[in-house]
A protein has these predicted regions:
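Long, low-complexity, intrinsically disordered polar/charged segments
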Residues: 104, 108-109, 182-200, 238-248
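Generic structural signal for hydrophobic
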Residues: 127-128, 152-155, 181, 185, ...
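Active-site-adjacent beta->alpha loops and helix N-cap segments on the catalytic face
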Residues: 119, 142-158, 173-177, 204-217, ...
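N-terminal capping/lid subdomain adjacent to the active-site entrance of alpha/beta enzymes
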Residues: 1-166, 170-172, 176-179, 183-187, ...
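Short helix-capping segments at alpha-helix termini
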Residues: 158-163, 187-196, 218-221, 294-295
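Catalytic beta/alpha-barrel core
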Residues: 114-116, 136-145, 164-171, 193-208, ...
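A short, flexible N-terminal coil/short beta segment enriched in small residues
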Residues: 75-91, 195-201, 206, 212-213
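Shared catalytic-loop signature of beta/alpha-barrel
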Residues: 67-71, 208-214, 218-222, 229-325
Length: 325
């Protein structure tokens, strides 16, 4: 059965640059995939790489897909192209599914609201709460640590008691700064009058797993790995090295969805699913994986990424988005 593959690269601009310890992110580049079989069934997929997390670039994904031509199904996607593995496998899964369009976007209470880095988080947090989010995520390691810890203390004073806060350092802290942050987090988490800090995400670079394990054992506040576990291979490696803290998983850059689901079902890890700032096409596939891998009660989904771009693509269906490009 012939399956035709069509590709559409895209670029979309953040309304405001996303500030993280990796630096400002202004443009999200990606690649949409459309498959159609001889029966007229269609499947969409998305390649949404994050090269600074270790994935391939859009150019590498495009070169691979174009080089395959009509033979694209006869060659396995190399492990070095995890975002391409996700995109192609998701598109094939949708093509084979009876009807992918029974789609239900999760409610805001099930989604973690994303706050801008810096002091602006103080003004945006109430808006996220008003939108229904009860878990919020704040990027740290962007401004001087004394300023950020000062803003943290203001933020938790302003949040309702049932709020949960995730702090994401994107591997940008030194060991001393990570300890400074964990002291500040434990001070909040031992005060029953304040909101809870759910975890400190990727405090150190991925090559410092031993230090992060020690931090996890030395403080009350949990540590989550993100950049350390970007692919299924890295998930398995950290698991095999004994990591039992939180695993933040971005399905769009993790590689094969089937392999990811197998890892989840085999090990039942403490998982938080996270967006790669993909479009509706990648989002639906990633959230479908999260739904299959997250036993209730699941932690809030790290998919508060809609509305961060300067376009209206988040309001479109996959077919409408494909036609728009
Ligand atoms: O995880 C979330 O809640 C939202 C997604 C998110 O924070 C990220 C997506 C992609 C790259 C990073 O800037 C960032 C992260 O590090 O988790
Ligand atoms: Mg992160």
């Amino acid at each position: 059965m012939g399956v035709e593959l069509a590709l559409k690269p895209y670029r979309r601009r953040f309304a405001q640059p996303l500030q993280t310890a990796h630096g400002p992110w202004m443009w999200r580049e990606g690649l949409l995939i459309r498959l159609e079989d001889s029966l007229g069934r269609v499947g969409y997929g998305e390649v949404a790489p994050i090269p600074w997390f270790g994935s391939e670039s859009v150019a590498e994904a495009l070169a691979f897909c174009q080089a395959q031509g009509s033979e694209w199904r006869s060659h396995p996607v190399p492990a070095e192209l995890p975002a391409t593995q996700f995109g192609l496998e998701s598109a094939m899964a949708e093509l084979a599914a009876e009807n992918f369009d029974i789609w239900q976007e999760p409610s805001s209470t099930a989604i973690c609201g994303l706050l801008p880095a810096g002091e602006r988080a103080l003004a945006i947090a109430p808006q996220r709460f008003a939108q229904g989010h009860r878990t919020l995520k704040w990027k740290i390691g962007v401004h001087p640590i004394t300023d950020e810890i000062h803003w943290l203390n203001q933020l938790v004073q302003a949040l309702p008691l049932d709020a949960r806060l995730r702090l994401d350092a994107n591997g940008g802290l030194s060991s001393a700064q990570a300890k400074q942050w964990l002291v500040a987090c434990d001070r909040v988490n031992t005060n029953p009058q304040l909101a809870t800090i759910e975890y400190l995400e990727q405090p150190l670079p991925p090559d410092q797993l031993t230090e992060m394990t020690a931090l996890g054992n030395g403080y009350q506040t949990a540590i989550a790995l993100d950049e350390s576990v970007a692919t299924v291979a890295q998930l398995e490696n950290c698991w095999d090295q004994g990591w039992r803290g939180v695993f933040v998983v971005k399905p769009a850059i993790a590689g094969s969805p089937q392999e990811l689901e197998a890892f989840c079902q085999k090990n039942l890890p403490r998982l938080v699913f996270s967006s790669a700032f993909e479009t509706v096409i990648g989002r639906r596939a990633a959230l479908a994986i999260a739904a299959r891998c997250s036993p209730a009660p699941a932690p809030a989904l790290g998919f508060g990424t809609q509305g961060w771009f300067a376009d209206n693509w988040d309001t479109l269906t996959p077919a409408e988005l494909w036609e728009r490009l």
